[in-house]
Structure formats: structure tokens, C-alpha cells
């Protein structure tokens, strides 16, 4: 890991300062958590896989016209990214019923949704990331109405691109969690932040519905590293 000052450490990544005030280093850890940190393990090599998979996906999104914080990969665990003021929201888009969605609405896992459903959650571990609606978002000033529409439009575009990308790898994109931020030197520019990897996507094999994401860890379904490596392999992402 870089010897520069750590700005922030989360559950799966560390953000490290650089000499350029407009960029930071994003370091991918091997830590795996579930149920708001109630379940925890270190799985050697997990961070390396996520670094490469996320870089690959961010590059695909940039090619498709989506603005992201990704600049380039520095090494097996680190990326250079644009420094952002993170919007304190997790934006979840669902294509197939799974996880908490099934529990909240008593719906069977695996039911295809007629169209993608977007949900917002307030990023706050102490409050267990509560679900919020657009009125909450406006009241607390996290986004303006115009910005909210921009985030929703961008989210659906990202979802469409990734549904197709994973489908070509014989994988269903069940749902995914996105985060956005504003450039430090341009408070009106909202771009995609964080990562896109098996850590924050639900991914199922299209033939067997075998889980290839963090649910393998959550539900004790097998070897997490093997599942993540399978995703990388199907996307033709090189890990060395």
C-alpha cells in the first residue's frame, strides 16, 4: 500500500492521498463483511480480483459515455481515481427479486421484475443504511430535484450497459449498488464513484442460477474467491 496519508478507510477499500489534490488512490482490501459487519473474514486475493474487475467495468462504462472517477490501474491493488465529494447515498437498481427486496415485499427470489427498480439508501453504518425516498433526499439536501433525475437517468443507463455486458458472459445482473460524487473542483458535475465488482453486484449464472457474488460469503455457499475468479474469467479480465 502507498505510504501516503490515508484519508478514509472503509470496509473493503482505503482512500489514500496523492501529491495532486484532484486525485486519490483507491486501495482494494481483502476484507469481506456482511450484515453490517456482523460477519467478517479476510479472503486473500479478493481485493486483487475486485480491483481488476472494477477497472475493466469502469473502462467499459467510460467507452459508453458514462463519466466515472476511474483514471487508471496503478498495480494489482490500487487505482488512481478522481477525488470526489461523495454523495451519502447508495443507489440500488434491481432487475430480479433478491435479498432484502424479497423480505420487504414477501416476494419469491428469482422473480424477474418487469422493469428495473431504483431504491435509495442513506450511507450510514450506525443507522444500518436506512432506505430513503426522494422527499428525504431533497429535505436533507443530498441532491437537488434536477440532480436526482440525473442520477436516476445515469443509473438506468449504467444498468442497461452492465446487463448486456454480463449477459454476454452468461451471467444475470440481478441487482447492483452504485455510489456517486461531485468533483472537488466542479460541484455541479456528478460522476460514478466507488467500484463495480462482485462485492456490490448480485450475479447469477444464467443456466444454473449459481451465485457468483458476495452472497456466497453471506450465505455460506462455498468459496468466495473461486466465485469472483469465475466472474473475472467470463469477462476475460486478466488478474496478473
From Swiss-Prot:
<dbReference type="InterPro" id="IPR001636">
    <property type="entry name" value="SAICAR_synth"/>
</dbReference>
<dbReference type="InterPro" id="IPR050089">
    <property type="entry name" value="SAICAR_synthetase"/>
</dbReference>
<protein>
    <recommendedName>
        <fullName>Phosphoribosylaminoimidazole-succinocarboxamide synthase</fullName>
        <ecNumber>6.3.2.6</ecNumber>
    </recommendedName>
</protein>
<dbReference type="InterPro" id="IPR028923">
    <property type="entry name" value="SAICAR_synt/ADE2_N"/>
</dbReference>
<comment type="similarity">
    <text>Belongs to the SAICAR synthetase family.</text>
</comment>
<dbReference type="GO" id="GO:0006189">
    <property type="term" value="P:'de novo' IMP biosynthetic process"/>
</dbReference>
<keyword id="KW-0658">Purine biosynthesis</keyword>
<dbReference type="GO" id="GO:0009236">
    <property type="term" value="P:cobalamin biosynthetic process"/>
</dbReference>
<dbReference type="InterPro" id="IPR018236">
    <property type="entry name" value="SAICAR_synthetase_CS"/>
</dbReference>
<keyword id="KW-0436">Ligase</keyword>
<dbReference type="GO" id="GO:0005829">
    <property type="term" value="C:cytosol"/>
</dbReference>
<keyword id="KW-0547">Nucleotide-binding</keyword>
<dbReference type="GO" id="GO:0005524">
    <property type="term" value="F:ATP binding"/>
</dbReference>
<comment type="pathway">
    <text>Purine metabolism; IMP biosynthesis via de novo pathway; 5-amino-1-(5-phospho-D-ribosyl)imidazole-4-carboxamide from 5-amino-1-(5-phospho-D-ribosyl)imidazole-4-carboxylate: step 1/2.</text>
</comment>
<keyword id="KW-0067">ATP-binding</keyword>
<dbReference type="GO" id="GO:0004639">
    <property type="term" value="F:phosphoribosylaminoimidazolesuccinocarboxamide synthase activity"/>
</dbReference>
<dbReference type="InterPro" id="IPR033934">
    <property type="entry name" value="SAICAR_synt_PurC"/>
</dbReference>
<dbReference type="Pfam" id="PF01259">
    <property type="entry name" value="SAICAR_synt"/>
</dbReference>
Amino acid at each position: 500500500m502507498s505510504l501516503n496519508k490515508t484519508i478514509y478507510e472503509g470496509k473493503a477499500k482505503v482512500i489514500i492521498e496523492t501529491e495532486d489534490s484532484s486525485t486519490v488512490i483507491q486501495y482494494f482490501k481483502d476484507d469481506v463483511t456482511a450484515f453490517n459487519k456482523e460477519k467478517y473474514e479476510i479472503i486473500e486475493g479478493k481485493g486483487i480480483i475486485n480491483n481488476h474487475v472494477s477497472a475493466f467495468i469502469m473502462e467499459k462504462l467510460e467507452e459508453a459515455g458514462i463519466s466515472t472517477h476511474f483514471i487508471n490501474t496503478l498495480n494489482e491493488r490500487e487505482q488512481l481515481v478522481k477525488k470526489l465529494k461523495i454523495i451519502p447515498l447508495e443507489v440500488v437498481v434491481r432487475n430480479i427479486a433478491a435479498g432484502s427486496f424479497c423480505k420487504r415485499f414477501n416476494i419469491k427470489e428469482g422473480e424477474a421484475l418487469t422493469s428495473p427498480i431504483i431504491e435509495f439508501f442513506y450511507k450510514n453504518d450506525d443507522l444500518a443504511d436506512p432506505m430513503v425516498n426522494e422527499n428525504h433526499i431533497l429535505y436533507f439536501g443530498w441532491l437537488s430535484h434536477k440532480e436526482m433525475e440525473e442520477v436516476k437517468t445515469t443509473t438506468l443507463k449504467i444498468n442497461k450497459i452492465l446487463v448486456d455486458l454480463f449477459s454476454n458472459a452468461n451471467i444475470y445482473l440481478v441487482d447492483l449498488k452504485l455510489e456517486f460524487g461531485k468533483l472537488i473542483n466542479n460541484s455541479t458535475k456528478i460522476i460514478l464513484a466507488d467500484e463495480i465488482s462482485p462485492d456490490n453486484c448480485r450475479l447469477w449464472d444464467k443456466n444454473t442460477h449459481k451465485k457468483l457474488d458476495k452472497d456466497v460469503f453471506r450465505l455460506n455457499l462455498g468459496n468466495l474467491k473461486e466465485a469472483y475468479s469465475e466472474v473475472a474469467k467470463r469477462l476475460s479480465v486478466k488478474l496478473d
